[in-house]
Amino acid sequence: MPRETPPPPPPEGGEVHEVVEGEDGQAEDQEERWARLLPELMSEVVRRVEASGGERWPARKDVVSCACVCRRWRDAAVAVVRPPAESGKITFPSSLKQPGPREFPMQCFIKRNKKNSTFYLYLGLTNATVDKGKFLMAARRFRRGPHTEYIVSLDADDLSQGSNAYMGKLRSDFWGTNFKIYDSKPPYDGAKASSSRSSRRFGSRRISPQVSAGNYEVGQVSYKYNLLKSRGPRRMYCALECPSTQETWENCLKTKFRKPTGNTVLRNKAPRWHEHLQCWCLNFHGRVTVASVKNFQLVAAADPNDPASSKDEETVLLQFGKVDDNIFTMDYRQPLSAFQAFAISLSSFGTKLACE
């Protein structure tokens, strides 16, 4: 009988690893079993996770984990979790570009790092002015010729336009008085990306080819010129592409990526002069504690063709102000999104050559 050839010995210093056939297949089968669950059961699981302490961060990460199982679980989670306008909660990255609630503001705060010109946005987790917070976005300031740009990203360690986490940017003119807000995604179907040289994005590492990556202008922020150096606070005006405040979430879904949503015009709320303190004052309801030229409140500008719009002039849609040397609060509500509010707040940093 022929002698059986023994297996070759392992290389010197090497290790012998036992290969178990089918491990990858078992993992795939397990994932398929999760994906084969009835949609109704998936939705019920997400509802129970949300109800069992998953309403606030950090426990809300369990809801996000459900959406990470597979595509069907993600669809189920997105269907169950209501947007910020209805729930008052920020859950998924997409929530950052959806309008906030109408009845109360989303309370956030910004931390500034002067050394590297970076700004970090956090969602407040308690009623305290500043707490540990849930990180939402970051922005870094860059000087590009006569312009200043703030690149906004979901990743605090990758603040570039080529990043998968790129959200958009804010770009100023030479004077620092006029800004344009750019979104990385088209606000509606057929929107044209900016063709300026600084907005072209070479070497993009984005994975998803379904939605074009670029810079789409979605808003402007302007500060009124003050060449005579007259005494008084800054004056601001904003024009943004936002859904109407009367739009429901279902209507927003129907019209998304179909047509322009129209402009929402905001102006700063005029402060009053405090004779005793000899300064301009606004009521920030305890959310701002340090006097600063950067502090502001924005309200909807009255439409001369709509008498009812004057009633909304007293509702503060965005307020921003200083509480420490490098900490600022930022509270926003419908129709603004967290991304829009962050971009407007960033415009308050830096020197306004013609305003100060």
Curated annotation (Swiss-Prot):
Every F-box domain range: 32-88
SUPFAM superfamilies linked to this entry: Tubby C-terminal domain-like
Record PROSITE patterns: TUB_1, TUB_2
Pro residues bias (residue ranges): 1-12
Pfam families, alphabetized: Tub
Region listing for Disordered, in residue ranges: 1-31
Reported tissue expression: Ubiquitous.
Positions with biased composition (Acidic residues): 21-31
Family: Belongs to the TUB family.
Entry protein name: Tubby-like F-box protein 1
Record organism: Oryza sativa subsp. japonica
